[in-house]
């Protein structure tokens, strides 16, 4: 469980939330198996170890969220209640195996048939695993407008953004239900051949529909080599709240922002991820804003005569960029440097992974000795 949850966390942070919800529901549906001391202790250890292994990732995220306000909380891209589907639309799109878009996500024809069979199975005495079917129906409900997502719009669960993301888990569950074949449908060779035929033909139809529906998105080579930033990756909601994204796009080359009456700046260099320049402050102090979107960790190394010191960057209230207050004469190097929390998180992860590996090694060594003694 630890390995699986760690892998999911590294692949997609939001998926941790969804899988955790699924695990919680699974435990509730099968509470008789889980509400035992040894099982609960095993789950607690797995959860704790997962947090330790992901400390290098989770602690920096928590630090950034605590340090400043991001659009994901102040101005979210969407509210989760706005992205759920009417159940009728979900069924129609599934029957048609509609090409996937945010408004047409569906189960596909075969899995939808499996869903219908699962619902019908609830009335049969032959079917043993009715709780599993019940859990499947709860996940289906969570995708639709029947679920009260509006109550969760202003909670951390809003970061899931799109309820149809649960269709991934739902699809795996339905595939598992079909593979169990409690009705004994696939014990005959011809039914297995029919299933393979339906799967292949359904795939062919879906591919044809995909090509036909995307004709308007065909690009020339020149257009392909100059993609819009949105197609590379959006993520606007993880910008600082002060950032005006549209204004930022208009200025492809952002110079240093300062008052020439207060400070003279020369020898400006801007290689990737770094800015350096010489400065001479005319008055007591001067503020210089650099073209870096502010995140905790940007730091300036200032050289003044025979002294060298480090200074943290600050957040500008206008524009959300990183700023620096200077005095005297000197040279500045600005770049992102790992914070103490990031270093501690990395150390926790390395120690926990190393400790786990060492303990497993000792366990295997002990087992090997016991076998030799026998």
Which stretches of residues belong to each language-model region?
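Proteins with a high burden of low-complexity, intrinsically disordered sequence enriched in S/T/G/P/A and R
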Residues: 1, 9, 162, 223-235, ...
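Membrane-embedded transmembrane-helix bundle of lipid-linked glycan/lipid transferases
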Residues: 1-211, 331-335, 341-374
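Alpha-helical structural elements
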Residues: 52, 159, 219, 226, ...
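Membrane-interface segments at or immediately adjacent to transmembrane helices
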Residues: 211-264
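Active-site-proximal, structured, solvent-exposed surfaces of multi-pass membrane proteins
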Residues: 247-374
């Amino acid at each position: 469980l630890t390995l699986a949850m760690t892998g999911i966390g590294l692949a997609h942070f939001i998926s941790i939330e969804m899988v955790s919800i699924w695990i919680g529901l699974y435990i509730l549906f099968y509470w008789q198996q889980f509400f035992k001391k040894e099982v609960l202790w095993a789950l607690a250890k797995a959860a704790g170890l997962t947090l330790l292994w992901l400390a290098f990732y989770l602690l920096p995220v928590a630090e950034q969220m605590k340090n400043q306000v991001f659009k994901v909380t102040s101005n979210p891209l969407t509210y989760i209640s706005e992205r759920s589907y009417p159940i009728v639309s979900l069924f129609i799109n599934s029957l048609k195996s509609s090409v996937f878009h945010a408004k047409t996500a569906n189960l596909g024809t075969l899995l939808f048939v499996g869903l219908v069979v699962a619902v019908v199975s609830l009335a049969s005495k032959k079917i043993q695993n009715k709780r599993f079917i019940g859990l499947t129906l709860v996940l289906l409900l969570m995708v639709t407008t029947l679920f009260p997502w509006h109550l969760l719009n202003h909670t951390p669960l809003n970061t899931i953004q799109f309820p149809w993301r649960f269709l991934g888990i739902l699809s795996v569950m339905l595939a598992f239900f079909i593979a169990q074949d409690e009705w004994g449908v696939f014990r005959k060779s011809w039914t297995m051949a029919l299933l393979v035929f339906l799967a292949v033909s359904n795939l062919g139809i879906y591919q044809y529909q995909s090509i036909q529906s995307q004709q308007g998105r065909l690009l020339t080579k020149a257009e392909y080599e100059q993609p819009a930033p949105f197609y590379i990756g959006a993520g606007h909601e993880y910008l600082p709240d002060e950032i005006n994204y549209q204004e930022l796009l208009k200025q492809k080359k952002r110079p240093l922002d300062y008052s020439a009456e207060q400070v003279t700046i020369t020898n400006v260099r801007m290689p990737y991820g770094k800015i350096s320049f010489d400065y001479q402050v005319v008055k007591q102090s001067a503020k210089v804003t650099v073209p870096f979107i502010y995140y905790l960790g940007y730091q300036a190394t200032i050289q003044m005569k025979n002294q060298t010191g480090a200074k943290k960057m600050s957040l500008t209230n206008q524009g959300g960029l990183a700023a620096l207050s200077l005095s005297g004469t000197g040279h500045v190097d600005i770049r992102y440097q790992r914070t103490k929390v990031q270093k501690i998180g990395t150390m926790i992860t390395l120690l926990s992974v190393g400790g786990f590996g060492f303990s497993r090694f000792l366990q295997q060594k002990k087992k090997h000795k016991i076998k030799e003694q026998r």
